């Protein structure tokens, strides 16, 4: 009896883990694919296109795909917002990594610079023209969206879920 119950619990926990992993991975992969599809368009990678033109297009796309924001960053690592001065993101580790390696970056959760309160995960993708990095696009995924994935998966199976960050820290738990 006890061995059977243990095996059932083990299977339920494994199924919940697979479910959470698939859902979180799907959201990140979806974000990477969206950014990649935009990054190959000259209207985004070409530095001769004014930054605010890029931002206006991104603002329309943001709401459609359910992100906090999708932003343009220029080659000087400044992020642009309509109606505001460009803000430097050069001190952000993920931006330094992206601009030095040319590889997409996915962050752990952090408080968004826009308000300093909203927790989010960021997916950033480089913009390149003739092999040179001309900037990047990034999108922010609400922390609560990821937490809800954990809650739904753990509530369904009656298990607990913990999201571990890239440095082994607990990002969220149910």
Question: Which residues are covered by each model-predicted region?
Answer:
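Amphipathic alpha-helical segments in well-structured domains
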Residues: 10, 55, 91-95
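Short acidic-hydrophobic sequence patches enriched in Asp/Glu that either
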Residues: 9, 87-90, 163
């Amino acid at each position: 009896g006890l061995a059977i119950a243990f095996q059932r619990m083990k299977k339920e926990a494994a199924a919940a883990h697979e479910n959470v992993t698939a859902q979180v991975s799907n959201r990140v992969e979806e974000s990477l694919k969206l950014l990649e599809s935009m990054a190959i368009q000259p209207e985004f990678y070409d530095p001769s296109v004014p930054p605010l033109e890029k931002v206006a297009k991104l603002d329309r796309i943001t709401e459609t795909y359910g992100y906090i924001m999708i932003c343009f960053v220029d080659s000087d690592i400044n992020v642009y917002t309509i109606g505001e001065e460009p803000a430097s993101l050069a001190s952000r580790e993920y931006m330094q990594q992206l601009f030095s390696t040319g590889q997409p970056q996915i962050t752990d959760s952090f408080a968004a610079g826009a308000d300093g309160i909203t927790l989010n995960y960021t997916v950033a993708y480089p913009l390149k023209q003739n092999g040179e990095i001309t900037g990047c696009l990034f999108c922010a995924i609400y922390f609560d969206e990821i937490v809800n994935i954990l809650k739904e998966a753990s509530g369904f199976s009656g298990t607990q879920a913990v999201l571990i960050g890239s440095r082994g820290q607990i990002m969220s738990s149910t």
